[in-house]
Amino acid sequence: MKFSTILTALTAVIATVAGYETSGKPHTVDILIDYSIKETPELSQNDVANWVNGDKYTLEYVVSNNEETEIAVVGVTGQFKNPVTNQIVTNLTTGQVGPITVAPGESIKFEQIVDVDLMANNYELFPYVFVAHDDLIKVIPCRGQLTSVVDATISFFDPRLILLELVLLVTFGAAAYFIYEIWGKQYLKGTAPVKVPARKSGSTVSKKGASATASGFDESWIPEAHLKKNKKKA
């Protein structure tokens, strides 16, 4: 098998696989491919893989060649589909593998890194493996894996959250300052109590004011004629 020919063909296939969907006349091959998730090896195809946005997950493939001639694993890709409508949501990045030669009756292993960057929702993952066999590049679909993608929780000490908190504090502080300068200061001036100076204790009465006589009462308001009568009697 000429690997230069295989690689040339693989390059052409990868260039047209961005919107990959199986088409054309199917070819029957006796090649078995299965995979597991490295981070959660206990999950089966009937389980749901819980993935977090922004994380990376590793798919560990096992390829068994039951053909009479050798094969070569040359690439891998995949799709996330809506599990209800079966519509394609996004394609995985197509990557080159090896080529890894697999003799008849033997098996090999290889890995694929999956970067999760999806809307939080439920999906079904369908990987596809490119295999060179009889000078042809054949695309072999793998089993589906249900996945539930959730957004990562943000820690209180996350630098992004701390930066957001600082921006909010500065914004509210500036707003409070301008409100005080425009309305608060004038309002406080208008409602402040006015201080009245207290009269000093022990102050003397003005000379122009009324004065008490020895009799103990103020005579300034008594008519003069009445005062004269009182003086005569005395």
Curated annotation (Swiss-Prot):
Membrane-crossing segments per the record: 162-182
Protease found in the keyword field: no
Source organism per UniProt: Candida tropicalis (strain ATCC MYA-3404 / T1)
Membrane topology: Single-pass type I membrane protein
A cellular-component GO term for this protein: endoplasmic reticulum membrane
Main subcellular location of this protein, as a coarse class: endoplasmic reticulum
Matches recorded under PANTHER family: TRANSLOCON-ASSOCIATED PROTEIN SUBUNIT ALPHA, TRANSLOCON-ASSOCIATED PROTEIN, ALPHA SUBUNIT
Keyword Membrane: yes
Signal peptide: 1-19
Lumenal side: 20-161
Top-rank taxon: Eukaryota
Keywords: Endoplasmic reticulum, Membrane, Signal, Transmembrane, Transmembrane helix
Name of the molecule in the record: Increased recombination centers protein 22-1
Alphabetized Pfam families for the sequence: TRAP_alpha
Stretches assigned to the Cytoplasmic side: 183-234
InterPro entries the UniProt entry points to: TRAP_alpha
Localisation: Endoplasmic reticulum membrane
Functional summary from the UniProt entry: Is probably involved in a pathway contributing to genomic integrity.
Protein family per UniProt: Belongs to the IRC22 family.
